[in-house]
Amino acid sequence: GVRLESQSWGADHAPEVDYTGSSMVEVVKGAECIRYGFGAMGGVVLLNDAPLPYDSTRFHVKGSVNAGYDTNARGVSGSGTLEAGYKRWGMRVHGNYTKGGDYHTADYILNNTGYNNIALSAMLGYKDKNITATLLSSIYYQRSGIYYGSKISDLDQLIKRFEAGRPDVSTLRNFSYDIQPPFQQSQHFTVKGEVKWRINDDHQLDIVGSFQENLRQEFENRKKQQWSWIPMQDLILKTYKFDVTWNAKWHLWNMTTETGLANTYQENFNYPGTKQPAFVPNFAALSMGGFTLHKAQWGKLQAALGLRYDFRVMSVNGYTSLSNYTYYDDFKLYSNFTSSLAAHYQISDQWDARANVGWSWRPPDINELYAIGLQEGSYWVVGNRHLESERGYKAVLGTKWRNTKFSVEPSMFYQRIDSYIYDHIGNGKDRYHNHPSGKYPKFIYDQDDVRLVGGDIEATYKPIEPLTLVAKGEWIFGRNLSRQDWLPFMPSDRYGLSASYTKVLGNRQQYVASLSLSGIYVAKQTRFDPDKDLVPDSPDAYFLLNGTADFAIKLPHKREIKFMLVGDNVLNTLYKEYTDRFRYYAHERGANFSLRTLIRF
């Protein structure tokens, strides 16, 4: 795959990615994160495409169709994939469409929260004994509404809204698919070419080049209705990437080496005519890096060492205000090393242990430096041009024990970050911002030295072959060492318990039925400072019950029909998530039931 480059500075900016077009999800942790540059040492999630159908002696076509309906927001969705292969050639085309209207919490509707998404992609490939070449092109469009009830012009009313934590009943309307200002829309185009050259049995060279273009427009309510259809933000981001990677195998100690160079050039431009200062300025940025990842094995011990150097240079210019035309022209240069050492030891057939320690850094993002404006339609953001790079280290320890019926896997981590970048609610006069569309809480970027400590545990039990029980727990403690208080907006403790049952039926085992039920309990967050929040208390603890039932019919020639019923928050719990900034205005989504049909042919 290729790293998505978009205007990802908004918590409400969903990644412009069609998840239905990816057949494999890969989670990368440990020393292997060194491949993906600064900011990736915590782990990387990859959405990978399945290999194209090469080597068919005759022209062969197969595909799939997926259709679904969601009760919450009355959403409809449909996707289809068609792929063909003949000898050394393979191709795949994919399309997806989703549409939904206003969604409901457990108690009330949230108007103007509809969405429309359209995605198209095509992939062509060639493969012979030594060369594999692919060309991928995709386009993704999304339009999503923003709940308008966060527009409140009176400060006393805004504070009362925070205390109530839910909309005024008089502002609620009937369900609709219409999307009116405030809303946002974006379009993302990607083209990627990749060549894998198998030099010999032990050496391979990978070359990847890509271009991405991201268009984003954001609309807000203005004084006059006709002005509301003029975008407040109108941006285009262009990204050019070129990566080269060499992979080698060595016969001594089963060693492997992966060495690569990564180059990225970006240009961001704000179209004029918005009558509003740009949220992020115009900029050009060049990032270059080189890495090496070396692995070896000595009996039961496996080890990996990764080293990387990156630098990033940015040229920035923009206006902080249109009223006095305050212009700035800035230049930033960041560089540093990243390293990681990982080990895995097989103590016995049933027990293994792993450890990883890494030193990493991250330069501030463009929004953290220069942002000024409304985000998520609900709070005002102010960047900090004086931010430095984050630097720190992280140590992870874990182990796993298993037998034929039971397994348990605990892990823990300790992380120290100097100059950690985060945003917090302003104090005094900086607590709220007065804007023509309303009054909003103000979040200001800052940095301090912090410590993060946490862990998780997962236990799996199979009392009988078709039944699997899984229990999980997750904890994280974030402490601000510079100010000697808790870090704001850190996740609460989470606990989960799930059960899944799968049964193969029929004389020819052509039917597969499965049921799963899962419960998630999220504790009340007590590790926070009430004086540095907009409300004096954190949301209550909550419990969510989810379930899935599906029935598959296997047909000749690897064809299949599957029916699925998925339930989220089936008890229709009214709850809030502590880390969600929108919790000051409303609750999370209520119950949703999805009915889906998948046909493979």
What is the predicted function of each stretch?
Residues 3-29:
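Short acidic/polar hinge/loop motifs at secondary-structure boundaries
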Residues 44, 49-84, 95, 110:
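Short strand-turn segments of transmembrane beta-barrel domains in outer membranes
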Residues 46, 81-181:
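Periplasmic-side early beta-strands and strand-to-turn transitions of outer-membrane beta-barrels
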Residues 127-141, 175-324, 328-340, 344-346, ...:
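Face-selective signature of the C-terminal outer-membrane beta-barrel domain
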Residues 150, 265-269, 311-322, 331, ...:
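Surface-exposed extracellular loop regions of Gram-negative outer-membrane beta-barrel proteins
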Residues 233-245, 289, 382-388, 394, ...:
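Outer membrane beta-barrel strand-and-loop segments of large Gram-negative receptors
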Residues 361-362, 416-418, 423, 469, ...:
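C-terminal beta-signal and adjacent terminal beta-strands/loops
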Residues 413-416, 435-525:
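Gram-negative outer-membrane beta-barrel transporters
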